[in-house]
Amino acid sequence: MIKKICSVLSMVVFLGLLVIAGFLFVPKMLGYDEYAVLSGSMEPGIPVGAIVYDKNFAASEAREGAVVTYQLPAGTLVTHRIISVDKEEQTVVTQGDANNIADTAPVAWQQIVGVYAFHIPY
C-alpha cells in the first residue's frame, strides 16, 4: 500500500514539474520572450503579476490597437497599447488600458522589443 502511495505521489510531482517546465521553456523554444507586469496600467485585460509573452516586433505591426512592450531610455520595460502611429517619424504613441491619458513621449520603433501574443495571469 505504501509503495502504491509513493508511486502515485512521485507521478504527481513529476507531472507538476513537467507542467512548470512547459510554462518556462516551451514558449522560449517557440520564439516568445516573457516579461512580468508590475503595474495595473493594462488592467483588467492584463493584471498585475501576469507574465506577458511577446513575439519579435516588425515595423508592419506598428498599428493602432496593437499591444507592444518597449524599453524606456532608463531601461524600464513597459507594455502598453498603441493609440497612434507616425510612419514618417517611425514612432508610436502608447497608453495603458487603465490610464486616462496617453504616455508623455512618443516611442521610437527601435525601442519596441516585442508585440503582445498572450499572457498568463499570476
PLM segments and residue spans:
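Structural motif
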Residues: 49-51, 63-66
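Extracytoplasmic
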Residues: 30-32, 63-65, 77, 87-89, ...
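Residue-level detector of beta-strand face positions
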Residues: 67-69, 93
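Protein maturation boundaries and topogenic segments
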Residues: 1-50, 56, 121-122
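Short beta-strand-centered aromatic/proline hotspots
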Residues: 37, 66-67, 78-85
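Extended, hydrophilic extramembrane loops/domains of integral membrane proteins
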Residues: 79, 83-122
